Amino acid sequence: MARSGFTETGHGRIAWTETEGEGPAVLFIHGNSSAREMFGRQFESEIGRRYRLIAFDLPGHGESSDAPDPAATYSIHGFADAAIAFLDARGISQAVVVGWSLGGHVALELLARWPGTVAAWITGTPPAGGADMQVAFLPSENMGLTFKDQFTEEEARSQAQAGAGEGVPLEPWMLAAAMRADGRFRPLMLQAAIEGKDLDGRKIAGTAPQPLAVVTGGAEPFVNNEFLTSVTYRNLWDGKVHVLDGLGHAPFWQDAPRFNALLSRFLDEVTR
């Protein structure tokens, strides 16, 4: 069973869903122009029965409100501020953080900034600094949409399909989430990155003492998997980058059983 609600923060009204598992808290953070429903196949699994899984819609996404101050919120750093505000408002003092794509960059900031971060897991996310951007990502047509302010329905469909995976049937809410996202956040997020407002993900990966799991699809269309293995990590879980053969940008949706088995082992180990 899961329950949903809304929490007021200085970054807007945050929509969330959580399971009734009695184990430690696990915070899930979705990607660019997506929504918390992306993690449904984890919430409905045995993991959701054993752990308190919490997913929220980033400001300007899903059922959350748009940010009242877009310049303060619509960046990786600002989304991390919003996540911390949400956790504080909910009275959550410790959590494992699981981030996908943009959410993975937010998870890295939490790893560095929020004392309650027990461990972090990133998927579809290169732990990159500003100087790494040209090599951390693969060139693709959809990368051009990442920072575009407004989507046509065709562009929203393309963005949602690329996120879900080639050949993966799109759920209606995936397209709706891409259409709903506050388009102001995309160029503002790019501007913040250019201005150096976000923390250096590569530096975080190399210095954070908490366990960091790095998991990627073997057919990842956006992230350069060779870059992932070139990064120096201080505490890389399992001592390696996990590559899930044949899967794309959202392996947790595309092949939930395979993904969940790995996530379950990670959670069991880092919360002992």
What are these regions (language model features)?
Residues 36-41, 63-66, 105, 223-224, ...:
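Short N-terminal helix/helix-N-cap motif within the alpha/beta-hydrolase-1
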Residues 46, 209-247, 253, 258:
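Conserved loop-alpha-helix segment in the C-terminal half of the alpha/beta-hydrolase fold
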Residues 132-133, 149-207:
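Conserved alpha/beta-hydrolase catalytic His-Asp/Glu region
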Residues 105-108, 112-150:
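Flexible "cap/lid" loop of the alpha/beta hydrolase fold
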Residues 12-66:
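Conserved HGGG/HGGXW glycine-rich cap/lid loop of the alpha/beta-hydrolase fold
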Residues 30-32, 95, 99-104:
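Conserved alpha/beta-hydrolase "nucleophile elbow" surrounding the catalytic nucleophile
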Residues 1-28, 48-51, 92-93, 240, ...:
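Alpha/beta-hydrolase fold catalytic core
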Residues 10, 54-98, 261:
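Active-site loop/oxyanion-hole signature of alpha/beta-hydrolase fold enzymes
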